[in-house]
UniProtKB/Swiss-Prot annotation:
Belongs to the IUNH family. RihA subfamily. The keyword Hydrolase applies. The gene is rihA. GO terms for cellular component: cytosol. The keyword Hydrolase applies. GO terms for biological process: nucleobase-containing small molecule interconversion; purine nucleoside catabolic process; pyrimidine nucleobase metabolic process. It comes from Salmonella choleraesuis (strain SC-B67). The active site is at residue 240. CDD domains: nuc_hydro_IU_UC_XIUA. HAMAP family: Pyrim_hydro_RihA (MF_01431). This is Pyrimidine-specific ribonucleoside hydrolase RihA. GO terms for molecular function: purine nucleosidase activity; uridine nucleosidase activity.
Length: 311
């Protein structure tokens, strides 16, 4: 039986590719997609979900827009990474269908209520919508199998020296998720910076030769440029969000540890930092499965294999 999932995302190039991967995978049943503000404004990320589902010919999947700002802060966006549209690069279709009239939280709650089995929530943007769901529907916690997030880092940040972007945007929401008691799987920068797509990989995807693999290559062409900056020390571009879906499909290509994670919400220098108790110093029981490494070639091969689904 396919694993039921809800995807909460803020497309964004890597989020768009995560959608492509999820919808090419019969092991997963995508029951709903909700949009969060982060990589771009809430209007643009919602539009980008609809554009991607139009491209992938999946207007049957319910879509709803989420919170317009973080729980307690003003919104920060990453337009310097993802461009004016949030998906700059390829020519994507205009949406062929409309989102649901309700909110992301309402769609998530309805999906959980109606599911015969617990649902995995995959959250690849800031955690605002998921935190709102957890706070407003405690009766539905048992319907959530796990929450798989792209966010955080044991080591270095990518938005501040200490903080990864998604967590920095809404640290209060992330703290709610980590302390919810629901199993959390964290794909942070420790693993996503190892899930780099090289120039040769982009050409491999392009050579698959179907319309979707071509679009993915064009998304990566744009995304690649930002990551050429020498400060990162990258060979390629890190594919953050797809690590969440790849872990659901092939956990064996990832190395993980079980640790307690908390989120710093007030630090002068460390606001938005995910504090990972690697050496069990706090006495707190582990609340997260933390990805620390990935078989990069296995990750690339999985993407290439699933892109052939769209032939």
């Amino acid at each position: 039986m396919a694993l039921p999932i809800i995807i909460d995302c803020d497309p964004g190039h890597d989020d768009a590719i995560a959608l492509v991967l999820a919808l090419a995978s019969p092991e997963l049943e995508v029951k709903a997609i909700t949009s969060s503000a982060g990589n771009q404004t809430p209007e643009k990320t919602l539009r980008n979900v609809l554009r991607m589902l139009t491209l992938l010919k999946r207007p049957d999947i319910p879509v709803a827009g989420g919170a317009v700002k973080p729980l307690m802060r003003e919104l920060i966006i990453a337009d310097n990474v993802h461009g004016e549209s949030g998906l700059d690069g390829p020519a994507l279709p205009e949406p062929s269908f409309a989102p649901q009239s309700g909110t992301a939280v309402e769609l998530m709650a309805k999906t959980l209520r109606e599911s015969a089995q617990p649902v995995t929530i995959v959250s690849t943007g800031p955690q605002t919508n998921v935190a709102l769901l957890l706070n407003s529907h405690p009766e539905l916690h048992t319907k959530i199998a796990r929450i798989v997030i792209m966010g955080g880092a044991m080591g270095l940040g990518n938005w501040t020296p200490a903080a990864e972007f998604n967590i920095y945007v809404d640290p209060e929401a992330a703290e709610i998720v980590f302390q919810s008691g629901i199993p959390v799987v964290m794909a942070g920068l420790d693993v996503t910076h190892k899930a780099q797509i090289h120039a040769a990989d982009i050409e491999r995807f392009r050579d698959i030769g179907n319309p979707i693999s071509t679009i993915v290559a064009e998304l990566l062409d744009f995304f690649f440029e930002y990551h050429k900056d020498e400060k990162w020390g990258f060979v390629g571009a890190p594919l953050h969000a797809p690590c969440t879906i790849a872990w659901l499909l092939k956990p064996e290509i990832f190395t993980t540890v079980e640790r307690w994670v908390g989120v710093e919400t007030k630090g002068k220098y460390t606001q938005g930092m995910t504090v990972v108790d690697y050496y069990f110093l706090t006495g707190n029981k582990p609340n997260a499965t933390v990805m620390v490494d990935v078989d990069r070639q296995g990750f690339v091969d999985l993407l290439a294999e699933r892109l052939q689904y769209y032939a």
